[in-house]
């Protein structure tokens, strides 16, 4: 979900259409480069088609157009149009092979809190199921975490988090939302980076583990460590890179042995 730290106000958007290469759910571009919403949308549809070739994407297309209109003139700290964020949330959900209602909810997860669009309008356009998902994500985003008591209250907060979501898909959308926010933390202040990282370590990563979503859990852990204890993280990266040739040689030896049989 977005807060004051995620928005950079309004300004005219300069369209910088550039080729976007996407590898394992990440955009391979320099941080200062813009990502074109249309290219990201096509990447989303390609992902959906991969696990559901006959999927009816009409609802997803409609959600994208409505979300883009609702978030127009809104920008993230990075300077990107705000629609980039819900698009990435939807892409993460597609990587998890979620149904179209969940992907649509991911695309619209911020509209009730951050725009003039209402739940009744979402229900009228997309049905009650999607509206309930968006409502659930909005309510989870309103949970207050006490920085001073977060560690002591972590288990109770996790239980509250799980209890508030009547549909497990609400939590999955929220995890996807947090994951993309963590991926773009370089645009936040150091204090906010540490605060969000601690929340993620204590609340979000353990919930992802409980749900068996190891892919998200692992990345949340990595990103949290990167911003909460950057010295430790950088040392780990250095050690892993130093051992990379050794690991690659070992893998090649194993492959060679297997090939003999």
PLM region spans:
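Active-site helical microenvironments for divalent-metal-assisted chemistry
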Residues: 2-261
């Amino acid at each position: 979900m977005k807060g004051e730290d995620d928005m950079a106000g309004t300004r005219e958007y300069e369209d910088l259409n550039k080729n976007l290469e996407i590898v394992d759910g990440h955009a391979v571009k320099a941080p200062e480069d813009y990502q074109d919403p249309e290219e990201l949308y096509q990447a989303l549809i390609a992902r959906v088609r991969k696990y559901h070739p006959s999927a009816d994407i009409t609802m997803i297309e409609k959600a994208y157009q409505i979300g883009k209109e609702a978030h127009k003139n809104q920008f993230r700290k990075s300077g990107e149009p705000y629609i980039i964020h819900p698009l990435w949330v939807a892409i993460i959900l597609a990587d998890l092979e979620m149904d179209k209602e969940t992907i649509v909810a991911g695309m619209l997860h911020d509209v009730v809190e951050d725009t003039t669009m209402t739940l009744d309008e979402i229900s009228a356009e997309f049905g009650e199921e999607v509206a309930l998902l968006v409502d659930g994500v909005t309510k989870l985003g309103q949970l207050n975490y006490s920085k001073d008591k977060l560690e002591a209250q972590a288990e109770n907060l996790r239980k509250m988090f799980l209890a508030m979501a009547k549909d497990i898909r609400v939590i999955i959308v929220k995890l996807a939302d947090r994951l993309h926010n963590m991926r773009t933390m370089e645009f936040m202040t150091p204090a906010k980076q540490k605060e969000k990282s601690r929340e993620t370590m204590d609340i979000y990563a353990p919930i992802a583990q409980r749900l068996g979503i190891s892919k998200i859990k692992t990345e949340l852990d990595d990103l949290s460590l990167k911003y909460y204890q950057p010295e430790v993280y950088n040392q780990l990266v250095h050690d892993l890179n130093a051992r990379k040739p050794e690991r690659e040689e070992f893998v090649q030896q194993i492959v060679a042995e297997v090939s003999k049989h």
